[in-house]
Amino acid sequence: MQYPKNYDVVVIGGGHAGTEAALAAARMGAQTLLLTHNIETLGQMSCNPAIGGIGKSHLVREIDALGGAMALATDKSGIQFRVLNSRKGAAVRATRAQADRILYKAAIRHTLENQPNLDIFQQAADDILVENGRATAVVTATGIIFNTQTVVLTSGTFLGGVIHIGLESSKGGRAGDQPSIKLADRLRELKLPVGRLKTGTPARIDARSVDFSVMTVQPGDTPLPVMSYMGDVSMHPEQVNCYITHTNARTHDIIRENLDRSPMFSGKIEGVGPRYCPSIEDKIHRFADKDSHQIFIEPEGLTTHELYPNGISTSLPFDVQLEFIHSMKGLENAHITRPGYAIEYDYFDPQNLKPTLETKSIDRLYFAGQINGTTGYEEAGVQGLLAGTNAALVTCENNEFDVWTPRRDEAYLGVLVDDLITHGTTEPYRMFTSRAEYRLLLREDNADQRLTETGRKLGLVDDVRWQAYEEKMEAIASETARLKDMWATPANALGKKVTEQTGEVLSKEATAFDLLKRPQIHFADIAAITDSQVDAQVGEQIEISVKYAGYIDRQQEDIDQMKRLENTALPIDFDYSVVSGLSNEIVQKLAQVRPSTLAQAGRISGVTPAAIQLLAMTVKKQKKVKAALNAS
């Protein structure tokens, strides 16, 4: 049957990508449907119960700056918070939160169910109807047809999903859930470039069977961090400890002796697994010289005894899992509540995507999350937000934007998408700060300053968040002006206080603002001396802007040069064979990727600076010819 309501956006999948996509589209005013195989699993944390980490928290903050749900849900469910790299530079500091699975899922569901313009429907999607090269409807497992102007597909690991435990395998999207077989077959019929990837998860353990007394305690940070710009420590539930144990020589021997029973090493799994989150059998094989690996024992929540042993993801047979877990200190009597497993699934070459995450081959069909070859909740969520935003822009009038995608210098989201569509991926892609060439400008702490104004123009940021952002920016400007007006000299009261509190002897006069340039003086010192009343976030922004000013200015100069290339668009149907002087190899690479700008063309492996110059000259010449024809 035809469903009586027509939608602007239909989102398939209720994981981290799907929920952010649906919320973004609905916030912008699009009539949105979120189609999920099970309403009870909306926002499910299928693997580790944690949000954030190196590179990942930057993405979470960007989702938050654009009005998304992930960061606030983390503040409402986080049972341990830590700042990683806290002693390193501001660019690489990252917040990580251990989350209560049940509380996180509840927070996401509450947000979804209270979002205007958003309907939720429980049923699997079996087909996407395409007419004249454009997605027009989604068909469910029972034949219900939802007509729509755009489709966002966020299928996670469900497309053609196969679960492996030892040499036994079964079809599944994750443990306990059916895979999407018909939809996977349909996408293959549409001739989209498909591949197979693999990911895995460890066994879960009953905390009552664990001896924590022989493990290292890993407490959270004090004072407690927050994940969202709108978050507050008062939102946090009860805080708990994590623990650390280690594998040992016996553990490694057990695993090595059973590699022939591993689906990875026997050749049963064809898909490539995540390089930066390998299974324990892969770690022991690749790092044969190491006789021990850290294993983090992480609580799954406040109302469950289940533990997540981070670091022993595996697809070995259950009897082997039991044996190697029992070989570790503190886990000698551990009761396994769920076995670890690997899952193999379909993904589609992200080089077939536009920067908006719309497919190049089918109009108004957007992909987000693991279907694009990424791994991680944060990577999925930020893609979902981008895809949902651009799907909504197709249907909602916006005076500022026809489409939106951030550049590499604007957001880690821009880095992630550019990496995917330019280089593609043959293994699950994970974000790191090292992937961003402008990471000093793309800090976790300034995502709101980079993106919230854009989010407001897009319709993603509500009045409450916008007011909070404006108040913060006004406080930064006001406090900066105040500090610039306060002078310290070797003889005056302020100068003497500075020396007394910090040990820094003044040899000449300086403003309180300029004193922050000294490595040993921090905003907290100046705030105490000058009776500042601003909050820590404001002080942090002022201190970073002063201490890193020279480096930031140099990066900005690099960005200004790069923007000239970013502003030179390349038509999607550009004929690279007409560019005189390009080698056949470069022509083939450009034709395969179909870069949208000269800057993106320059990031393709093997495309030389000389080739970019030739391309720029040809584009300029063609523009002149076109202008002349239009004039006549």
Swiss-Prot record:
Its cofactor is FAD. GO terms for molecular function: flavin adenine dinucleotide binding. One of its GO terms (biological process) is tRNA wobble uridine modification. The keyword Transcription does not apply. GO terms for cellular component: cytosol. NAD(+) binds at residues 273-287. FAD binds at G13, G14, G15, H16, A17, G18. Keywords: Cytoplasm, FAD, Flavoprotein, NAD, tRNA processing. InterPro entries: FAD/NAD-bd_sf, GIDA_C_N, MnmG, MnmG-rel, MnmG-rel_CS, MnmG_C, MnmG_C_subdom, MnmG_C_subdom_sf. Its main location: cytoplasm. The keyword Repeat does not apply. It is found in: Cytoplasm. PANTHER family: GLUCOSE INHIBITED DIVISION PROTEIN A, PROTEIN MTO1 HOMOLOG, MITOCHONDRIAL. NAD-binding protein involved in the addition of a carboxymethylaminomethyl (cmnm) group at the wobble position (U34) of certain tRNAs, forming tRNA-cmnm(5)s(2)U34. Homodimer. Heterotetramer of two MnmE and two MnmG subunits. Belongs to the MnmG family. This is tRNA uridine 5-carboxymethylaminomethyl modification enzyme MnmG. It comes from Psychrobacter cryohalolentis (strain ATCC BAA-1226 / DSM 17306 / VKM B-2378 / K5).
